[in-house]
C-alpha cells in the first residue's frame, strides 16, 4: 500500500505544474518549427545575398525566377533554362557544315553559313530547271548554278524574272474559250513503205531551188498497200469554238481539205512535206470548225512561198516538214491564233516529258472511213522511244516520235497529216510535232508517228524569213495562185 506521504507529495507536484502553465508536450506547429529544415533561399540572411547559381539551382531545384535572379538577363537565363530543364540538345553537334547550334526546349536551331540551309545546315539544293521548271512560266535555262527564264515570241519576262506577260492581243499558245478534255487515243496514220532512212538532225540553210509547183505537178502516188496518204483523228471529240485556234486546213482546187497545218504567225503555217504531193495547187483555210457550215470566222489564203525540207525522204517520211508563207496575213481573233514555238532543249527536257500532247484535224474518223466534216481533237500520251521502235515495221528515225495508245481505238488518221501536235505547259500550248504517218489508223499495238519539231526549230526560223523568189529568177513562170517552192539543204 502506498505511503500517504508519497501520495501527498505527488499531488502537490501535479498541482504546481498546472498552476505554472508548463506542459510535457509541445504543439504540432512548434514541433514542425523544431524539426523542419530551413531552405537556404528562404532564410532571412540568404535573401539579402546576391543570387548564386550553385546555391540556387545546383544544390536544390530552382524556379525560372530564381535563375533569372542569378543571371539578371532574360536571354542568358533562357539559354541556361533550356539546358537545365531537358538537357543540352546541341551536345551532339547536330548542325553540319560549320553551322552554329542554339539549344531550345525539346529542340535546337541551326544558324547556317552561306551555301547551306535546312534544320541541320545541309547543302543548298538549287531550284534548277529540273525542279518545277526552275519556277519559270515558260523557257528555263541553267547558267552558273542558277536559272535563266525566258519567254516565247509575243511575251515579255515579268519583273520577278519568272513570269511571262503577253504583249499581244492574241498571244500564241492560248486557248481563249473552253478547255482541253482528255480522250483516249491510239496514234497511227498513213504508213510509209519499207525503206531505211538517215537519222540526223537539221539546221541547214535555205536556198531557192524548184520552179513553182514543179513538185506539185507530179505528186508521188501513195505507197502500195497504204491505207492512206493523209492522217486523221479516230475517236476524239469536237474542238469547241476557240479550243483549236492554231488549226489550219490545206484545201485543193475542188475546195476539199486534204491535209492540216499549224499556224505559226500571221503569214506562216507549218505542215508536213509529204502533203505537198497530195494536190497540184492548194490554199490554206483557217478558222474553220465545220467544213459544211460557214460560221463567219473562216479565212482562205493563197500560198506565196513553199519551203520544203530538202532532205525529205518520200520512202521513209524522214524530214517530213514544210513551211508555207501566205500572200496575205491571217486576222487573229479568239478562235484563230498561233501556237508557240519552243526552245529546243526545253522542248525535249520539259515539253516532251509531259504525259500527253494534243493532236487535231479533219481526218477520217476510222480507217478507210470518210473524212470528218468537223474539227476533232484528241489527247494522246507520249510513247517512249524503245516502245515506239518495237511497235513499227518501218524505220523510226531521230526526227520522229510516237504518241498514242496501243489498244484504244483512237488516233490520227488519213486527212490529219501535216496537222498540229501541241503540248500544254502552264496553260500555254507549244508546237511539239507534225502529224506524219502511221500503220493504218488506231490499230492495236501501233502508234501514230510525228515529225519531231524540236529538231527543226532553227530550220523553221530560217524558213519563216524566206521571201518569194522574183519571177525573173525562177526557171519558170508561176501562175497567179502558184507558190514559189524553195528547198533547204543542210
From Swiss-Prot:
Signal sequence bounds: 1-20
Task: Please provide one cellular component term from the Gene Ontology annotations of this protein.
Answer: extracellular space
Here the segments flagged for biased composition (Polar residues) are 203-212
Spans annotated as Disordered: 183-230
Q: What is its main location?
A: secreted
Question: Its GO biological process terms?
Answer: blood coagulation; proteolysis
(3R)-3-hydroxyaspartate is found on 103
Q: List the disulfide bonds.
A: 57-62, 90-101, 95-110, 112-121, 129-140, 136-149, 151-164, 172-340, 239-244, 259-275, 388-402, 413-441
Q: Which Pfam families match?
A: EGF, FXa_inhibition, Gla, Trypsin
**Which PROSITE patterns did the record assign?**
ASX_HYDROXYL (PS00010), EGF_1 (PS00022), EGF_2 (PS01186), EGF_3 (PS50026), EGF_CA (PS01187), GLA_1 (PS00011), GLA_2 (PS50998), TRYPSIN_DOM (PS50240)
Domain (Gla) ranges? 41-85
| Function summary | Factor Xa is a vitamin K-dependent glycoprotein that converts prothrombin to thrombin in the presence of factor Va, calcium and phospholipid during blood clotting. Factor Xa activates pro-inflammatory signaling pathways in a protease-activated receptor (PAR)-dependent manner.
Supply any other comment: Calcium also binds, with stronger affinity to another site, beyond the GLA domain.
The identity of this protein, by name, is: Coagulation factor X
Underlying gene: F10
Amino acid at each position: 500500500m502506498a505511503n500517504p506521504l508519497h501520495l501527498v507529495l505527488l499531488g502537490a507536484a501535479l498541482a504546481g505544474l498546472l498552476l505554472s502553465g508548463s506542459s510535457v508536450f509541445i504543439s504540432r506547429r512548434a514541433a514542425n518549427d523544431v524539426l523542419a529544415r530551413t531552405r537556404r533561399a528562404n532564410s532571412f540572411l540568404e535573401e539579402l545575398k546576391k543570387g548564386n547559381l550553385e546555391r540556387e539551382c545546383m544544390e536544390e531545384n530552382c524556379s525560372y525566377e530564381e535563375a533569372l535572379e542569378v543571371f539578371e538577363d532574360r536571354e542568358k537565363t533562357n539559354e541556361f533554362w533550356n539546358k537545365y530543364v531537358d538537357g543540352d540538345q546541341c551536345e551532339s553537334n547536330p548542325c553540319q557544315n560549320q553551322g552554329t547550334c542554339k539549344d531550345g526546349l525539346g529542340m535546337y536551331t541551326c544558324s547556317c553559313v552561306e551555301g547551306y540551309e535546312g534544320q541541320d545546315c545541309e547543302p543548298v539544293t538549287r531550284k534548277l530547271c529540273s525542279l518545277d521548271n526552275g519556277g519559270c512560266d515558260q523557257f528555263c535555262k541553267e547558267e552558273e548554278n542558277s536559272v535563266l527564264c525566258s519567254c516565247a515570241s509575243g511575251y515579255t519576262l515579268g519583273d520577278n524574272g519568272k513570269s511571262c506577260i503577253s504583249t499581244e492581243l492574241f498571244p500564241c499558245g492560248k486557248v481563249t474559250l473552253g478547255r482541253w478534255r482528255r480522250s483516249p487515243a491510239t496514234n497511227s496514220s498513213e504508213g510509209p513503205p519499207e525503206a531505211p532512212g538517215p537519222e540526223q538532225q537539221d539546221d541547214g540553210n535555205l536556198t531557192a531551188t524548184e520552179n513553182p509547183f514543179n513538185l506539185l505537178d507530179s505528186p508521188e502516188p501513195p505507197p502500195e498497200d497504204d491505207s492512206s496518204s493523209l492522217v486523221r483523228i479516230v475517236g476524239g471529240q469536237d474542238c469547241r469554238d476557240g479550243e483549236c485556234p492554231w488549226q489550219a486546213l490545206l484545201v485543193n482546187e475542188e475546195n476539199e481539205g486534204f491535209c492540216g497545218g499549224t499556224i505559226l504567225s500571221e503569214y506562216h503555217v507549218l505542215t508536213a512535206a509529204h502533203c505537198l504531193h497530195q494536190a497540184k495547187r492548194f490554199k490554206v483555210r483557217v478558222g474553220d470548225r465545220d467544213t459544211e457550215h460557214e460560221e463567219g470566222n473562216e479565212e482562205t489564203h493563197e500560198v506565196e512561198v513553199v519551203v520544203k525540207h530538202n532532205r525529205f525522204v518520200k520512202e521513209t517520211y524522214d524530214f517530213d516538214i514544210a513551211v508555207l508563207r501566205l500572200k496575205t496575213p491571217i486576222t487573229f481573233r479568239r478562235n484563230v491564233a498561233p501556237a508557240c514555238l519552243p526552245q529546243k532543249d526545253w522542248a525535249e527536257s520539259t515539253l516532251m516529258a509531259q504525259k500527253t500532247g494534243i493532236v487535231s484535224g479533219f481526218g477520217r474518223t476510222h480507217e478507210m472511213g470518210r473524212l470528218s466534216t468537223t474539227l476533232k481533237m484528241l489527247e494522246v500520251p507520249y510513247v517512249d522511244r524503245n516502245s515506239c521502235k518495237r511497235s513499227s515495221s518501218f524505220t523510226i528515225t531521230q526526227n520522229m516520235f510516237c504518241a498514242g495508245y496501243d489498244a484504244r481505238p483512237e488516233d490520227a488518221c488519213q486527212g490529219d497529216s501535216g496537222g498540229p501536235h501541241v503540248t500544254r505547259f502552264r496553260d500555254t500550248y507549244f508546237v511539239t510535232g507534225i502529224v506524219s504517218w502511221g500503220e493504218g489508223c488506231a490499230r492495236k499495238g501501233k502508234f501514230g508517228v510525228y515529225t519531231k519539231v524540236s529538231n527543226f526549230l532553227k530550220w523553221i526560223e530560217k524558213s519563216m524569213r524566206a521571201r518569194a523568189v522574183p519571177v525573173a529568177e525562177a526557171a519558170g513562170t508561176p501562175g497567179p495562185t502558184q507558190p514559189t517552192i524553195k528547198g533547204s539543204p543542210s
